[in-house]
Regions:
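N-terminal amphipathic/basic leader segments beginning at the initiator methionine
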Residues: 2-21
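Hydrophobic helix-and-loop "lid/oligomerization" segment in the mid-to-C-terminal part
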Residues: 12, 20-24, 30-151, 172-173, ...
């Protein structure tokens, strides 16, 4: 699928508009073979689904059928055998993970699984402190584990680049099992690790799903460990709830069938009563919907879990899921909520500062944006990744933000756009970096403050070679053009079959041209409500945080929209509603 030229090139927000061109022959073939509605099939074609079997599978994910065999991960048999041996011989096992949602859910999945197999008194969990230890497995953690008598270390969401730590563990007689999903570096996976479970690199060459989150890799290990357990299916189904949270929060590809099945099944489980006091308390405090959706995970549950590692210590998350009583769980969930409120405040302060800089430089922005400052200046390490995402959304440019500490070291996060592979970009400046790692669209790095300007210049030189000017800036691409009479409650419910939405499977975006504009109202001086249509076909269209565009709409008789379809449920009555992403006056 490719974007087509449009008369409207930009909306009033400044975003560039595109309309996807659909293969009409493939569309008609699918329509005949599946009997599905055209608008649904257009969306599926836009997500790369052009065969009937794939379409049917996508629309009806099956948890057990869509999970790949864990033994397709090359080192799975060795990992399983070693962990079973450790439990049999009463050897201590240390689980070390990242401090984000993917890492903390992985920790809970692995610890619960190993405890079910008889390792209750053998398992310890360790999460590095973001501010004093930084990201990843370190030599200090390995040495400490050796001194405390651990004979096995299992990592999750970290470790794929820990070559030195793998060598150290081997030297100290510790067997290191790595569960990760990040890209290995040029050396491939750590050769001296006892086992590496990763869908990327040589260890995952036969694994079909290259977009598995670390919690997904942890679930695969649980699958294999529990292969002979009489309650395996029920346990794996329960663990899928945490896997769904980690998968959505880590923003992996939800068009991938295995991820889709995990999230769909996990969300169903989350919508049912839980026997875990911590999960119950977290869901209650997060005020999630019924049923729970990826939006609830991404914007309510996930941020509260993430907040602990961003502003304090992620151990609070592990304590929550280990809580034995509702009273204890409620206190711990409230603590996460307070952490999240603090995170929101420091994030707001930093974003306001960065938005001002962007606005001042809007006519001369670099291809790649790099911001740096001290914590006293508002550059708090815990919110850099979120701030990057917001600036990318605002500018449509790869963005890196780093916080400089008192020793002159800058720790940073990066987020990207299509066409700019972050790891390859960081590879191009690796000689000025202390360390780095991540994915094509998200990465982390450490650099000496004195090297930041050199890094900025070289990243932009690299960007000039791989990014055209036309690829920069915010772009909105519609799945299809829609008329007002098709934007019904029934159509919206039909499109809900595309859920769960996320990376790789975004909520459908539609172009609606030259709609009669009846009125524009301000809501709480922040948002806009547009009344659109004629006579009996009036429909409400809401545009959040768009009050600044009210003057541009004043006096207009017609408006074109980039929008999403929604249902407004009130007093047992359902009405259609539009969520505006951008608008244009032709």
């Amino acid at each position: 699928m490719s974007p087509s030229p449009m008369k409207i090139t930009r909306g009033i927000s400044g975003a560039r508009w595109q309309l996807t061109v659909c293969d009409e022959a493939a569309l008609q073939t699918l329509r005949i073979e599946t009997g599905e509605e055209e608008i649904l099939l257009r969306c599926l074609l836009n997500r790369g689904l052009s065969h009937t079997a794939n379409v049917k599978k996508f629309l009806a994910p099956e948890f057990s059928a869509d999970l790949h065999s864990p033994n397709l991960l090359r080192d799975m048999p060795q990992a399983v055998a070693r962990l079973r041996l450790a439990i049999r011989d009463r050897q201590r096992i240390l689980i070390v993970t990242d401090f984000d949602v993917d890492g903390t859910t992985s920790s809970v999945i692995l610890s619960q699984t190993l405890k079910l197999l008889g390792g209750t008194d053998l398992i310890s969990c360790y999460i590095p402190n973001r501010f004093t230890e930084g990201y990843g497995l370190s030599p200090q953690i390995v040495e400490k584990a050796s001194k405390e008598g651990f004979q096995v270390i299992v990592t999750a969401d970290i470790g794929i680049k820990s070559h030195a730590e793998a060598r150290l563990a081997h030297k100290l007689g510790i067997d290191l099992i790595i569960c990760d999903h990040h890209l290995p570096d040029g050396e491939d996976v750590p050769a001296e690790a006892f086992a590496v479970l990763c869908p990327k690199g040589s260890s995952g060459v036969d694994y079909p799903n290259k977009h598995l989150a670390a919690c997904g890799v942890s679930l695969k290990l649980a699958q294999a460990l529990l292969a002979d357990h009489p309650k395996r299916d029920a346990i794996i189904a329960s663990l899928a709830k945490l896997t769904a949270i980690g998968t959505v929060a880590d923003m992996v590809d939800l068009a991938e069938s295995e991820n889709r099945a995990i999230v769909a099944h996990g969300l169903k489980g989350l919508s049912q009563p839980s026997n875990n006091p911590g999960l119950r308390a977290l869901l209650k405090l997060s005020n999630v919907g019924d049923p729970i959706t990826p939006f609830d995970v991404g914007f309510k549950i996930g941020p509260r879990i993430n907040a602990a590692g961003r502003v304090a210590h992620a151990n609070s998350v592990l304590n929550l899921f280990e809580a034995k009583t509702d009273e204890e769980a409620a206190k711990l969930a409230f603590q996460l909520d307070e952490f999240n409120s603090h995170r929101q405040h420091i994030q707001f302060v930093l974003l306001e500062k960065l938005k001002k800089v962007v606005e001042e430089q809007k006519d001369s922005l670099d291809r790649v944006l790099l911001f740096a400052g001290s914590e006293e200046e508002g550059f708090h390490r815990g919110v850099l990744g979120i701030a990057c995402s917001k600036i990318v959304e605002m500018t449509g440019r790869p963005t890196l933000i780093c916080a400089i500490n008192e020793e002159g070291m800058a720790h940073g996060s990066a987020r990207s756009i299509a066409g700019f592979h972050l790891v390859e970009a960081l590879d191009a400046v690796s000689d000025v970096l202390v360390k780095y790692g991540g994915h094509p669209m998200a990465a982390g790095f450490t650099v000496k403050a004195a090297q930041i300007e050199e890094m900025r210049w070289r990243l932009n030189r690299h960007a000039s070679e791989v990014l055209g000017e036309e690829e920069l800036g915010r772009v909105l691409t519609a799945d299809a053009e829609l008329s007002l009479d098709i934007a019904t409650v029934a159509t919206t419910k039909m499109l809900a079959r595309l859920e769960p939405h996320g990376i790789g499977n975004p909520q459908p975006l539609f172009l609606m041209r030259r709609l009669p504009l009846r009125s524009v109202q301000s809501l709480k001086e922040k948002h806009l409500k547009l009344l659109i249509g004629r006579d009996r076909t009036i429909i409400e269209a809401l545009w959040w945080n768009a009050a600044e565009y009210s003057p541009a709409l004043a006096g207009a008789k017609e408006v074109s929209l980039m929008c999403r379809l929604e249902i407004n449920s009130w007093n047992n009555r359902e009405t259609r509603q539009l969520k505006i992403i951008d608008a244009a006056i032709e």
